[in-house]
Amino acid sequence: MRITDLLKACSVELNGTPQTKEETIKQMVALMEKGGNVTDVEKYKAGVFAREEEGTTGIGEGIAIPHAKTDAVNAPGLAAMVIPAGVDYDALDGQPVDLVFLIAAPNTEDNVHLEVLSRLSMLLMDESFKQNLLKAKTVEEFLAVVDRAENAKNEAEEEKAVNVPDSGYRVLAVTACPTGIAHTYMAAEGIEKAASCLLYTSDAADEL
């Protein structure tokens, strides 16, 4: 499932001005509602806030990925907001957040939010990807940046599947994160990149 299949133009805001974490989430939920993915806005919003109580989704480096899986959602969806001035989101690194992606997943979809979270986290490992999103002047440009990054990622994965070495070392890495799984996915991506630089083959497993 591609990110661009879930992220509609009406659910993207390039000039967000929330002043607090609470305002940020409320505005993100309103963007999600525009996409028609939510049947009960208040219930979905409560689900997002409940997830935040378990641990912040401000993963650091100016990024937050709040999410909720609930029967208040009728179809998987994404919303995105750029906050030029940044906002205090209680992020893990204590820094302001200027890029937020909100994920909505229905209870009927098995782990769809984890799939989306995984793809987003891995793309956001590339600082140039994030900067291009922040610099986007139009929603269309923002979506085009996401589309190009996904295409490049898919091509790299296909090439990796074809060019599996017949010999050499293989590295198995198991990662875990006590504050949420976004860092687990990002760690797995980082391990694979490091292994590639050393010409090793890596199988990074996520402990969810």
In which residue ranges do the predicted regions lie?
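A short, hydrophobic C-terminal helix/tail in secreted or cell-surface proteins
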Residues: D203-L208
